[in-house]
Amino acid sequence: MPRTAKVATKLAACMLPVFYLAAALSAQPPSNSGSPPMNGIAHVAIRVQDLLASRAFYEKLGYQEAFALDNGGAPTEAFLKVNNTQFIELYPKHKPEEVIGFMHVCFASSSLEELNRYYASHGLEPTPVKRAGAGNLLFTMRGPEDQNIEFTQYMPGSKHTVDIGKHLGVDRISDEIIGVGIQMQNIAKAVEFYSGQMGFSRAAQQTHTDMFQIPGPSNQVVEISPKAADNRLQLILAVKDLKHTAEQLKQRGILSEKRNSKPILHDPDGNVIELKMAPMARDASQ
């Protein structure tokens, strides 16, 4: 065989793996980039009948009040700290028409402007990014059935950032909110909103068809459940040992019960707190 022919044959042989790789990649479905990644759940907000009673209950769970906001001396919001980046916000009821129970969930992002642009480009109507009362960046968006959704980016000098490392109760029953249940009348439309427009993905480790994973590395979830008359919150907390946690709660005068084999608690307004065994990456100092 002539030398030039041998060279051509060897070159073709060397190129075959490249061609096969290119063909394999082109045969794969295009990746769904989805929403820009988020850091997870920043807070859940609850309207409460009695702020003092609700705060006392959550303090029994080990959650200290990091700070509060007021209007002319009247309390408007209390921030109970789960970890350095997650809070339970309690809003006292001031008007008869205000509904007790779940108000909204807030997701944290390190690139709030990018997230805002993403939603706007997907037919949603996020409000402009602004600096909120606690000093962080914030925008909101109307979800299915006119439900409010918040998005925040923690900023240097904000009340949340200044409090890092503080108010981390050593007796917290959980160091992480790993999920929140959102009630909807039209489940199908809510599922389409969160998966189709917000870029949430079905939680791979779950069989529940209406449980979706928040974009990003948090492994936290949003569960879409049928609308109930009481509008109560469903909060999912990660614990390391269910039996030990139940014993701790009993010692503090808080009784748990089981629903669908899952241990749950009720706060003074009937909001549901579900305890779930889950590996927790953070330590007690976070």
Residue ranges and their predicted role:
Residues Q28-S35, N39-Q49, A78-K81, K95-E176, G181-I182, Q205-T207, ...:
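Vicinal oxygen chelate
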Residues L16, S33-S35, L69, F79, ...:
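Residues embedded in well-ordered secondary-structure elements
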Residues Q64-V99, N148-P156, F200-L233, P268, ...:
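Conserved short beta-strand elements that form part of the metal-binding/catalytic scaffold
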Residues M1-A8:
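N-terminal secretory signal peptides that target proteins for export/translocation
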Residues P36-N39, A45-F87, S121, V129, ...:
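Core segments of cupin and vicinal oxygen chelate
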Residues K10-A24:
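Bacterial N-terminal signal peptides
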Residues E65, V99-F102, T161-D163, L233-L237, ...:
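A short, polar/proline- and glycine-enriched secondary-structure boundary/capping micro-motif
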